[in-house]
Amino acid sequence: MVQNDFLDSYDVTMLLQDDNGKQYYEYHKGLSLSDFEVLYGNTVDEIIKLRVDKIS
């Protein structure tokens, strides 16, 4: 079975920290890898933790 990770969907959880030291979570459900790349590239706050779960 050939798997194409670019066609799959992912749930993403990020713990972020702003310039004032405030930490907060962002949740994004059902992202493609392309969507994740855009999200990651556009995140201005520091990523403290990142979790990416493949949706089965």
Curated annotation (Swiss-Prot):
Signal peptide: none annotated. Gene3D superfamilies: 6.20.250.30. Keywords: Early protein, Host-virus interaction. It holds the Pfam family UDG-inhib_P56. InterPro entries: P56, UDG_Inhib_phi29likevirus. The keyword Translocase does not apply. The keyword ATP-binding does not apply. Transmembrane segments: none annotated. Belongs to the phi29likevirus protein p56 family. Inhibits the host uracil-DNA glycosylase (UDG), an enzyme which removes uracil residues from DNA by the base excision repair. Interacts with host uracil-DNA glycosylase and prevents the latter from binding to DNA. Since the viral DNA polymerase efficiently incorporates dUMP into DNA, the virus needs to prevent the deleterious effect caused by host UDG when it eliminates uracil residues present in the viral genome. Homodimer. Interacts with host UDG; this interaction inhibits the uracil-DNA glycosylase. This is Protein p56. It comes from Bacillus phage PZA. The lineage of its organism: Viruses, Duplodnaviria, Heunggongvirae, Uroviricota, Caudoviricetes.
